[in-house]
């Protein structure tokens, strides 16, 4: 899980979701997991 000031989709499978007021990117590729922090 990467923590970044701005998150964006890296590939077509990535999904942007809101979790507890935080924006996160989930993907089948674990390297693409990001959270805004």
Swiss-Prot record:
GO-annotated cellular components: cytoplasm; ribonucleoprotein complex; ribosome
In alphabetical order, the GO MF annotations are: structural constituent of ribosome
Q: Which PROSITE patterns match?
A: RIBOSOMAL_L36
Superkingdom of source: Bacteria
Could you tell me which Pfam families the record lists for this protein? Ribosomal_L36
Q: Does the keyword Ribosomal protein apply?
A: yes
Mind listing the GO biological process terms from this record?
A: translation
KW Ribosomal protein (keyword) present: yes
Annotated keywords: Ribonucleoprotein, Ribosomal protein
The UniProt family comment states: Belongs to the bacterial ribosomal protein bL36 family.
PANTHER family per the UniProt record, alphabetical: 50S RIBOSOMAL PROTEIN L36, CHLOROPLASTIC (PTHR42888), LARGE RIBOSOMAL SUBUNIT PROTEIN BL36C (PTHR42888:SF1)
Q: What's the protein name?
A: Large ribosomal subunit protein bL36
- What organism is recorded for this protein? Tropheryma whipplei (strain Twist)
Q: Give the gene name.
A: rpmJ
């Amino acid at each position: 899980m990467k923590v970044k000031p701005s998150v964006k989709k890296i590939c077509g499978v990535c999904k942007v979701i809101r979790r507890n007021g935080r924006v996160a990117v989930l993907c089948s590729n674990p390297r693409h997991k990001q959270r805004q922090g």
